[in-house]
């Protein structure tokens, strides 16, 4: 079992990508990470994960920040933009290369798909040139599971855990698994609160933390909001942006989804009073491991919960 060490001061974060506006699913993650930080009397930071320009929607970053403020989720310190962190990412890439922990790979997605979806280290010992190549992390000490403060101990598919994963894409963009580790360490994040759809890459990120001799944060993976078809609410699935009218009803819906105690007269409180009450009553143990929420529109939300444990098994 991998245990993390963290300093006394709590630092959490919310790191949306500007590929679309804030929707109800991302609001749940924002509220969960915000309340966990405030209940721990810690800081709550905002980072804009804008490392993939082709997927960015113009103006989305500023609209996300405006929506967070509208819902009373005020952050601490300055906003960090990943697009301004390329020098730091290159430094770590060079460090891994000098340590013999990375290599160039020219394998296509089609080839990997033909061999059951997992990379077989085909290019590991070929010493390929940089031309038209991705950079892969050379796994020497794979991580096969980790402790999640909500989900419990999660086991990874051994084949996935041992895979040499991409840390720099052939199109010149930095990979998520690399930059999230570098930036969470840079910001001093002590606990990562995010959705269960990001459970699988966690073991890869922990492997990087260990190889770079960085402190591993604690992890909390929250249940996902689903649409009426059972699909995750996401920008790719055209989830509707959260409305910018009275924030209280949707705040209460998000708290209900997280199975928090919602006192009947909370709807009579102001937005800030509501968040203060939510912080005072915040109970991590009440959050379901899995949740299901059916949304036909922003005025009709039905929540159900399922507390069965889960394992890392799907391929992202």
UniProtKB/Swiss-Prot annotation:
Binding site for ATP: 235
A GO MF term: zinc ion binding
InterPro entries: Glu-Q_tRNA(Asp)_Synthase (IPR022380), Glu/Gln-tRNA-synth (IPR000924), Glu/Gln-tRNA-synth_Ib_cat-dom (IPR020058), GluQ/Sye (IPR049940), Rossmann-like_a/b/a_fold (IPR014729)
GO biological process: glutamyl-tRNA aminoacylation; tRNA modification
Record's cofactor remark: Binds 1 zinc ion per subunit.
Binding-site residues, Zn(2+): 105, 107, 119, 123
Keyword tags: Aminoacyl-tRNA synthetase, ATP-binding, Ligase, Metal-binding, Nucleotide-binding, Zinc
Protein name: Glutamyl-Q tRNA(Asp) synthetase
């Amino acid at each position: 079992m991998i245990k993390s060490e963290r300093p006394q001061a709590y630092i959490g974060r919310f790191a949306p990508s500007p590929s679309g506006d804030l929707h109800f699913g991302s609001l749940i993650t924002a509220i969960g990470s915000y309340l966990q930080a405030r209940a721990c009397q810690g800081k709550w930071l905002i980072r804009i994960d804008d490392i993939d320009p082709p997927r960015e929607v113009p103006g989305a970053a500023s609209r996300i920040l405006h929506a967070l403020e509208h819902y009373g989720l005020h952050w601490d310190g300055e906003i960090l933009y990943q697009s301004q962190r390329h020098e730091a990412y290159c430094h770590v890439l060079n460090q891994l290369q000098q340590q013999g922990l990375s290599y160039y790979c020219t394998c296509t997605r089609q080839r990997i798909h033909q061999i059951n979806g997992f990379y077989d280290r085909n290019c590991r010992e070929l010493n390929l040139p940089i031309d038209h190549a991705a950079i892969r992390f050379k796994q020497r000490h794979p991580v096969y599971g980790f402790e999640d403060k909500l989900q419990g101990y999660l086991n990874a598919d051994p084949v996935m855990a041992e895979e040499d994963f991409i840390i720099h894409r052939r199109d010149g963009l930095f990979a998520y698994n690399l930059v999230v580790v570098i930036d969470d360490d840079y910001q001093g994040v002590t606990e990562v609160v995010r959705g269960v759809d990001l459970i699988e890459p966690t073991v890869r990120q922990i492997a990087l933390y260990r190889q770079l001799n960085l402190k591993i944060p604690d992890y909390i993976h929250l249940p996902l909001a689903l649409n009426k078809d059972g699909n995750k609410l996401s920008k790719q699935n055209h989830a509707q942006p959260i409305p910018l009218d009275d924030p209280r009803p949707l705040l209460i819906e998000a708290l209900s989804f997280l199975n928090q105690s919602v006192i009947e007269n909370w709807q009579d409180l102001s937005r800030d009073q509501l968040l203060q009450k939510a912080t005072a009553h915040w109970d991590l143990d009440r959050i379901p491991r899995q949740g299901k929420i059916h949304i036909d529109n922003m005025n009709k939300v039905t929540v159900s919960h399922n507390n069965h444990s889960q394992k890392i098994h799907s391929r992202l």
